[in-house]
């Protein structure tokens, strides 16, 4: 468990986190969103023990970050944003150095390096020099480094940036498996385009926690309307008429696509979908446009 109690953190004399209180439980995968400068990366670095806490407390079960370094306890794996400049050594040699620095010895190092490389599908490149890896492979090596000690907590800063398709699948699998293994995943997203396999959403603004809840649109009551895009092949105009009584406004984009705003106080999006199906109107897809976490964020900033 991660517990933050009235945590305040400064960066270069400016408050970056302002009395943030939040608890994250084993098995939760939490997506953190917010505008640029809202404190998202600062939150991760504070939990990782990389930034000092001015006031308040960060604790992990019975261990407080003010007295112990969670990274040294092999508790946390941290994947920073972007790629890093690596030494000109082999991939496996690089991980061996990090494993030793984490306190592993002898066979523990070999086992950890082999497992981490396989987990990110780099086992066949273990003997390659790091400077020969592609940017996507290099980002996967960062993930492997974070997984060396099988951490209970995995912190991901903008995890999909710079990843190749294999890396996308790895992050998705880690997130899905967290609920089964009890691992905590805390991931920062700069664009609020969050995959739906996360369990929770945390919104920051100006260094403060604005709202949080389970990863379901209905949990966020600050939104008064949802933007939706429907694909009704050759029937967009017909669809607009069918759900007119449920919408605040609608726009027929072309013969196939319709965008509309649905008020949250008239029922969920499923009601509009049900109305179209009942009327026999062809419906191929119905999606939030933009993604609903982004709409939650925009609504909070607007207010």
Placement of each model-derived feature along the sequence:
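Helix-to-loop junction immediately C-terminal to a conserved catalytic motif
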Residues: 48
């Amino acid at each position: 468990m991660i517990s933050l109690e009235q945590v305040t953190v400064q960066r270069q004399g400016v408050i970056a986190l302002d009395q943030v209180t939040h608890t994250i439980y084993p098995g939760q995968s939490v997506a953190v969103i917010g505008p640029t400068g809202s404190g998202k990366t600062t939150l991760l670095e504070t939990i990782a023990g990389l930034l000092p806490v001015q006031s308040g407390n960060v604790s992990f079960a019975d261990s407080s970050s003010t007295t112990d370094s969670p990274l040294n306890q092999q508790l946390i794996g941290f994947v920073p944003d972007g790629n890093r400049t690596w030494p000109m050594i082999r991939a496996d040699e690089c991980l061996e150095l990090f494993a030793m620095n984490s306190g592993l010895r002898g066979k523990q190092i070999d086992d950890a390096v082999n497992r981490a490389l396989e987990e990110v599908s780099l086992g066949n490149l273990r003997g390659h020099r790091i400077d020969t890896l592609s940017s996507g492979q290099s980002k996967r090596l960062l993930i492997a480094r974070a997984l060396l000690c099988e951490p209970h907590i995995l912190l991901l800063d903008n995890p999909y940036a710079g990843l190749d398709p294999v890396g996308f699948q790895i992050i998705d699998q880690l997130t899905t498996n967290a609920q089964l293994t009890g691992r905590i995943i805390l991931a920062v997203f700069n664009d609020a385009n969050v995959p739906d396999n996360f369990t929770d959403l945390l919104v920051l603004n100006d260094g403060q926690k604005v709202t949080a809840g389970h990863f379901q649109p209905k949990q966020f009551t600050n939104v008064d309307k949802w933007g939706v895009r429907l694909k009704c092949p050759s029937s967009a105009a017909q669809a607009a008429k069918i759900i007119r009584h449920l919408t605040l406004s609608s726009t027929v984009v072309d013969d196939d696509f319709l965008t509309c705003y649905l008020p949250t106080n008239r029922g969920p999006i499923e009601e509009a979908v049900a109305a179209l199906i009942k009327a026999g109107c062809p419906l191929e897809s119905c999606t939030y446009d933009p993604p609903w976490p982004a709409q939650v964020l925009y609504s909070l900033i607007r207010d």
